[in-house]
């Protein structure tokens, strides 16, 4: 069972020009629903295999819309939290992890599902149907390294999609490919330094329904102290 309250500031949203905004924002309902999952897993000293099927049923799913879209103002940049409608998702996921020798490990995972949302009486795709992940890692003494890959396919329509004369949607978001890596050295249990590489393939990926692009290849050098 899940239950999520609206953001605190969404409950008191208003502008000087339109007091109706405040009334509308106070009508926000909690997002709540149920998730059912069952499956099997096999675990040994060097590997694990997990298989699961799941079903999600969510009411009053949170979303965001501009004043202009809601007809309560003209500001296209002022995003207001709203209840979009009902959400459902049924799918299957498989995950495999393997240790190779004393230092190496790898993992593979795939999820296929059918995420849909109903905002106006019609169920439409709300997210990518296919997700694939893969990773490889190495650890020896105080050194740790990892390389991870994510693929999102069969994605939902863009926010700016068009509708054909037959009523069929087209213009789905392109597939997404992202690869990241981390090199970490832990001097002791409290101190560590990490070099992180993001978007190694330097893909111009669309990251959301509004067709915003992710960052190009970039990296960070971080120091962590744990206590």
Spans of features found by a protein language model:
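Surface-exposed extracellular loop regions of Gram-negative outer-membrane beta-barrel proteins
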Residues: 1-37, 48, 53-79, 150-164, ...
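Exposed loop/turn and edge beta-strand positions of beta-sandwich/beta-sheet ligand-binding modules
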Residues: 22-24, 34, 78, 90, ...
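Short sequence motifs at beta-strands and strand-loop junctions characteristic
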Residues: 28-32, 59, 84-88, 126-129, ...
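Hydrophobic transmembrane alpha-helices and their helix-loop junctions in integral membrane proteins
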Residues: 39-41
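Short, glycine/charged-rich beta-strand-loop motifs at protein surfaces that mediate ligand recognition
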Residues: 52, 165-173, 179-184, 191
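Gram-negative outer-membrane beta-barrel transporters
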Residues: 54-57, 75-161, 186-192, 201, ...
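Outer-membrane beta-barrel "beta-signal"
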Residues: 215-227
